[in-house]
UniProtKB/Swiss-Prot annotation:
Residues 28-39, 72-91 have a biased composition (Low complexity). One of its GO terms (cellular component) is nucleus. Disulfide bonds: none annotated. Belongs to the fl(2)d family. This is Pre-mRNA-splicing regulator female-lethal(2)D. It comes from Drosophila melanogaster.
């Protein structure tokens, strides 16, 4: 694009760039351009043809060959010098032109950058203007909405004011309102009272208008004061009497309520104590039931083991007496397991014949049977092992041991049941009472604190001359004397009276009475009686 083809708008950035260019550089460019134009106009490029002046001088001044040669050399030197100057000028002109072109290109690039920046700024400003216009529209719309709401509120306020304005009908309904009527009635009463007080005050003022020397007026005023004081005292007395009566009634009601509360609290404590006692009794009953169950299970197991042990001992005892003096001895033993409530059965056996005489022996199968025969160590060891296995308890009572002795009685052989003393189940102590400061304890519990109570349980065994069966503990206690006199055997034990017992068992002689006494003590404990002395 040439400078002439550029419009004024396009030339303005160039003019601005020329204005911005430093003056020294601008002057240098102008000098270079002027020098290049002058050199081109005057000399131009060196030509081989001589000029007119040179030709005239060459023709009109003939000189010798040497002089002509020097002139040619000088001309050549001048030409070379001019050529060098021209070349230098051309180079300077080319450099100036290149600089001018570079400056123009730089200005053009700057102008293009400025144009791009201006376009971007124009786009940005247009966008900002659009945003501003959009915001203006939004704000105008909001303003219109607010104005509409404001007008609506104004109209609503006007309607409310118009509605609240009292009309004639509203006033009439207000007069018919019970609350307004009550208010008017009170105002009327207050007005009447005020008028009455005003009249009384006026009358008093008129009565006070007497002379200071009049005695009648003075007496009347003193009497009025006295009556007024008496009236006040009477009112106080009546009010005080009523208040005193009400206070006494209130005090009586308070005392009655306190008594009721106290009795209720006592009843609550008593009921709580009863609940605790019932819980304790229930726990005791449960514990006793568990103990009874375990005791029954143990009794059954011991009965089974006892039956096995009796069979083994009977076989061992009867086996050595197989033959005596050519005779035979056969014994048939019938073992039966009898429960506590059942009777003992009579088991007939074959008699033992010794030289034609009948011999019946009382055999008591007990956990431990000490035999006088030294050759039966095996039997004694077996009995001791059985006793050690079956009777490992916390505290074992002395066992009654019966030694077989011959008696000239019937031909039947029976076995007596052994005595097994089972410790009575423990009972839980009662809980403390809240009404009483001391612990409530029964006589049976006090007795338990002093000495333990053991309840014997009879285990059936085979004994000679068995007594009649016992239906209950009371029947056994009642028939004890008859059994002692008829058969000579102590009930509940199967021990014959007068039979010698080994001296190594110190508790055997006192066993029957002690067992019966303990049975009675258990029954007395259940009935709540006093303690029993076990020393008898």
């Amino acid at each position: 694009m040439s400078v002439a083809a550029m419009t004024m708008d396009d030339q303005r950035p160039c003019m601005n760039s020329y204005d911005k260019m430093p003056p020294t550089k601008y002057e240098q460019n102008l000098n270079i351009l002027n020098s290049s134009q002058n050199s081109g106009a005057t000399g131009g490029p060196a030509s081989p043809t001589p000029s007119g002046l040179e030709d005239h001088h060459h023709h009109h001044h003939p000189h010798p060959h040497h002089h002509h040669h020097q002139e040619q050399q000088q001309q050549q030197q001048q030409q070379q010098h001019l050529q060098q100057q021209q070349q230098q000028q051309q180079q300077q002109h080319a450099a100036a032109v290149a600089e001018a072109v570079a400056a123009a290109e730089q200005r053009q690039r700057l102008l293009e950058d400025e144009i791009e920046n201006l376009k971007l700024e124009q786009v940005r400003m247009a966008q900002q203007c659009a945003d501003a216009q959009r915001r203006e529209k939004i704000l105008m719309r909001r303003l219109a909405n607010k104005e509409q709401e404001f007008q609506d509120y104004v109209s609503q306020i006007a309607e409310y004011k118009a509605q609240q304005a009292p009309t004639a009908l509203a006033l009439r309904t207000a007069l018919l309102d019970p609350a307004v009527n009550l208010l008017f009635e009170r105002l009327k009463k207050e007005l009447k009272a005020t008028k009455a007080k005003l009249e009384e005050t006026q009358n008093e003022l008129s009565a006070w208008k007497f002379t200071p020397d009049s005695n009648t007026g003075k007496r009347l005023m003193a009497k009025c004061r006295l009556l007024y004081q008496e009236n006040e005292e009477l009112g106080k007395m009546t009010s005080n009497g009523r208040l005193a009566k009400l206070e006494t009634e209130l005090a009586m009601q308070k005392s009655f309520s306190e008594e009721v509360k106290k009795s209720q609290s006592e009843l609550d404590d008593f009921l709580q104590e009863l609940d605790e006692d019932v819980e304790g009794m229930q726990s005791t009953i449960l514990f006793l039931q568990q103990e009874l169950k375990t005791t029954r299970d143990r009794i059954q197991t011991l009965e089974k083991e006892n039956a096995q042990l009796k069979q083994a001992i009977k076989d061992e005892v009867v086996a050595p007496a197989a033959a005596t003096n050519g005779g035979t001895n056969t014994t048939i033993n019938k073992l039966e397991t009898i429960h506590e409530d059942a009777c003992m059965a009579n088991n007939p056996t074959n008699p033992d014949c010794y030289n034609g005489n009948t011999n019946n022996e009382q055999i008591a199968a007990v956990p431990q049977i000490p035999l006088s025969d030294d050759g039966s160590n095996m039997n004694g060891n077996a009995a001791r092992l059985a006793r050690k296995r079956n009777y490992q308890e916390e505290e074992a009572l002395p066992t009654v041991v019966v030694v077989p002795t011959p008696t000239p009685v019937g031909n039947n052989v029976q076995e007596a049941p052994p005595i097994r003393e089972v410790t009575a189940p423990r009972t839980l102590p009662p809980k403390k009472s809240k009404l009483r400061g001391i612990t409530t304890r029964r006589n049976s519990q006090l007795e338990e604190d002093h000495q333990p109570v053991t309840t014997p349980v009879a285990v059936p065994m085979i004994v000679d001359n068995a007594v009649a069966g016992m239906a209950s503990e009371e029947a056994a206690a009642a028939a004890a004397a008859v059994n002692n006199s008829n058969t000579g055997i102590i009930p509940e034990t199967g021990v014959q009276v007068g039979v010698p017992v080994e001296g190594g068992d110190p508790g055997a002689p006192a066993a029957p009475g002690r067992i019966l006494t303990r049975r009675r003590s258990v029954r007395m404990q259940q009935n709540g009686s006093g303690a029993v002395d076990y020393s008898t």
